[in-house]
Amino acid sequence: MHDTFKHTTVLLDEAVNGLNIKSDGIYIDGTFGRGGHSRLILSQLGEHGRLYAIDRDPQAIAAAAEITDPRFTIIHGPFSALAEYAEERGLKGKIDGILLDLGVSSPQLDDAERGFSFMRDGPLDMRMDPTRGQSAAEWLLKAEESDIAFVLKTFGEERFAKRIARAIVERNREQPMTRTKELADVIYAATPVKDKFKHPATRSFQAIRIWVNSELEEIEQALKGALSALTAGGRLSIISFHSLEDRIVKRFMREQSRGPQIPHGLPMTEAQLSSLGGRQLKALGKMMPGESEVADNPRARSSVLRIAERTAS
């Protein structure tokens, strides 16, 4: 069933332009969402070009059914496995570009039934793929107080993590939470100092969502896989929405652009040096949305686009 939730693709032209599309190229859109990037890529491909799109959200897979273009293939699964999908199709080292639009999408946030938002009451779920893994409610009910505090601090940078974790555990002992509003209310009550511009539950909801979906591990795995999937000259175009995501992408591109770091003065033969390989990426810079895009779509404000190119080594 087609959903009616509006989704405005952030940095649409910039991210696709970063792929440097060739008409007969082979591309991966690792985060199909509602197909904004995929449709633009397809519009720039010739008859022999190919686009493989990936998403683990069943609603995104349903939306992809609207695209009947023979050059397009949709894959239901996590983008962390993009290298496996490429290898299964005999495309290892042959991909001309990979695009990733990280984080949660507007349709996921806006649909109360998905449980991502503290602004809309719904089931306390938060899974990108509701058919797999445990929901936020299930995890919070079973987790130790110290584990909850760790997640809130690490993935939400929440300064009241311990206090909020204690309140969550105490509430679940009385009556297990099953709704997003219940969790938001517990967090609100446990937060001693309120931010004038941000709901107290913002950081905690982000942290729990990242943990439930293993989002940062997914990114790290996808980045490593991209190196084996891309051909020389192939592009990597990645949009991040918060500092935790961008830090991983930035560090990866920097490290792969630098090549192996060898301690000064360490004796090595030419063969040993050669076996270490050279740099595998060339970082091509970053972009942020302009004022007009942020005005049209406030969720674009924190987005960062980073582009890199696979080297021949």
From Swiss-Prot:
It catalyses: cytidine(1402) in 16S rRNA + S-adenosyl-L-methionine = N(4)-methylcytidine(1402) in 16S rRNA + S-adenosyl-L-homocysteine + H(+). Specifically methylates the N4 position of cytidine in position 1402 (C1402) of 16S rRNA. The lineage of its organism: Bacteria, Pseudomonadati, Pseudomonadota, Gammaproteobacteria, Enterobacterales. It is found in: Cytoplasm. It comes from the Bacteria. This is Ribosomal RNA small subunit methyltransferase H. The keyword S-adenosyl-L-methionine applies. Its EC number is 2.1.1.199. The gene is rsmH. Belongs to the methyltransferase superfamily. RsmH family. One of its GO terms (biological process) is rRNA base methylation. GO terms for molecular function: rRNA (cytosine-N4-)-methyltransferase activity. PANTHER family: 12S RRNA N4-METHYLCYTIDINE METHYLTRANSFERASE, S-ADENOSYL-METHYLTRANSFERASE MRAW. Keywords: Cytoplasm, Methyltransferase, rRNA processing, S-adenosyl-L-methionine, Transferase. It is an enzyme of class 2 (transferase). Its main location: cytoplasm. GO terms for cellular component: cytoplasm. S-adenosyl-L-methionine binds at residues 35-37, 55, 79, 101, 108. InterPro entries: RsmH, SAM-dep_MeTrfase_MraW_recog, SAM-dependent_MTases_sf.
